[in-house]
Design a protein with these regions (language model features):
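Alpha-helical transmembrane segments of multi-pass membrane transport proteins
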Residues: 1-304
Length: 304
């Protein structure tokens, strides 16, 4: 999925998605900020990596917003916040990781993140509308310009159909759908947009390898700590004593939110998953609650 996103960045698909979002809402109050949020939502539907989303969408939108007069701190925070959509809207690397740690089917974690991700997107749009209502905006795009931008973005917009349609139709596993998305991104770059070259494809491979190496270096350390916790029998003790302390399920959610918020402030979301999901999943099951509910709440707070 990361490779597909990087190829779409180098092959011109990401730029056309951003142009389409800008043509739709760029003239609204805070239009460029809203366009970045929507573009992040588009990108989330075929990539699923927070780092890749900031690289692809942020590098295009952030200079435009700064040039338009948006405050630099707001632009940076908005890009980082909107990138959280990559962890909720499928296909999400966070969903795949959660499924690997809890044995919940990937198709279910993908489905669980759709509505919360869209709700979060809507609230981000509302915040931008309120905070940036006095910033000057570009001229509204004409109907012809919007239609051209839609046609330009259409191959990229078709990518989520390939990924999610293949998974839910039972034709592809998540790994196979990621491979198909990568091939489709190459086809778009070489034959549809004709902006992808062999050199830029190699650059996309290098960027994919770099992002993947960062993620797996974090996973390696987090796995070591997780194994230490397991051999220390800490999770079973917590699960055993948590109800005995008179803790309710509502109190558990409050504790989970605080812990995830604190850890997510200082640590990448991947090690937070490895360190805490096994413990939280066991407690959730002890209360006879759904692990999908845990997934959505966990990602929402740990990703802040």
């Amino acid at each position: 999925f990361i490779f597909a996103g990087m190829v779409m960045l180098r092959g011109g698909a990401a730029k056309r998605l951003v142009d389409f979002a800008t043509a739709l809402v760029g003239h609204w109050p805070g239009g460029l900020g809203i366009a970045m949020v929507i573009a992040m939502g588009f990108f989330a539907a075929f990539c699923g990596s927070i780092l890749a989303a900031i690289t692809a969408v942020g590098t295009i939108m952030m200079p435009k917003m700064l040039e338009q007069g948006y405050p630099r701190p707001f632009v940076i925070v908005l890009a980082a916040s909107a990138a959280l959509l990559e962890a909720l809207i499928p296909p999400s690397n966070a969903a795949i990781l959660f499924s690997a740690l809890t044995n919940v089917p990937v198709s279910q974690t993908f489905a669980a993140g759709v509505i919360p991700g869209l709700i979060l997107l809507v609230f981000m749009v509302i915040v931008v509308l309120i905070k940036c209502r006095n910033i000057r905006n570009p001229e509204p795009a004409s109907a012809a310009e919007r239609w051209r931008s839609f046609l330009g973005a259409l191959p990229g917009l078709f990518t989520p159909t390939i990924i999610l349609g293949g998974i839910y139709a039972g034709l592809l596993t998540p790994s196979e759908s990621a491979a198909v998305a990568g091939v489709w991104a190459i086809v778009m770059g070489f034959f549809i947009y004709r902006e992808l070259t062999f050199a830029s494809l190699c650059l996309a491979l290098k960027e994919t390898a770099t992002i993947t190496a960062i993620i797996f270096a974090i996973i390696a350390t987090a796995t070591f700590l997780s194994v230490v916790l397991t051999y220390s029998q800490i999770p079973p003790h917590i699960v055993r004593y948590f109800p005995d302390m008179g803790a309710t399920f509502a109190l558990f959610w409050v504790a989970l939110a605080i812990i995830c918020l604190l850890l997510g402030t200082f640590v990448e979301i991947v090690p937070v998953f490895y360190l805490t999901v096994p413990i939280f999943a066991a407690i959730t099951l002890s209360f006879n609650q759904s692990l999908l509910h845990l997934y959505v709440v966990f990602v929402a707070f740990a990703g802040i």
